[in-house]
Amino acid sequence: MWRPTSASAETTKTPLTICWIPIKRWVSSASLPCGAIYRQVWESAAFAGFLTGREAARRMVGRGRGTVIFTGATASVRGGPGFASFAGAKHALRALAQSMARELGPKGIHVGHIIVDGMIDSDAVRSKFPEKTAALPVGGMLNPDHIADAYWGMHAQPRDAWTFEMDLRPSVEQW
């Protein structure tokens, strides 16, 4: 399992904070979601991302360094049938990340957006989608440790070569 090394923690002298905000309901038809559902999904992704990013940036600007990484999905760049609420929220989160990156980059804050495109290999996913996960080929789901490595790699980039966005997906994922 991935863990930051004690050497990396000692050299940065910066606390590592991770914030995860799950979206509980994200599948809805463009013709069916009521305003309350659309708003709930938007608040869980876009507005929560804004609040979290704003508060993190406020604390980082004074130090002149820090990293804020937002997690996207395929819906960040492409809507699909049945994903109206989720796609709208993820598009908004990606636009927020772009705006923050342009504003905060010159102040030493690295803002990035990582699109996680595919099923994540976990007990929760395997129990919720047993038939689908069983049918996947070896390497058909994203390994959580490999996802963490990508996030850490983005965080550790030198200032002269910052990545704004990367896509993570299994090699067999259709995209």
Residues covered by each model-derived region:
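A short, exposed helix-loop element centered on a Lys and neighboring polar residues
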Residues: 53-54
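Structural signature of the Rossmann-like NAD(P)-dependent dehydrogenase/reductase core
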Residues: 30-33, 45, 66-73, 110-114
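Rossmann-fold cofactor-recognition segment
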Residues: 1-9
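A short hydrophobic alpha-helix cap/turn motif
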Residues: 61-62, 104-106
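Catalytic Tyr-X3-Lys loop
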Residues: 6, 23, 30-50, 93
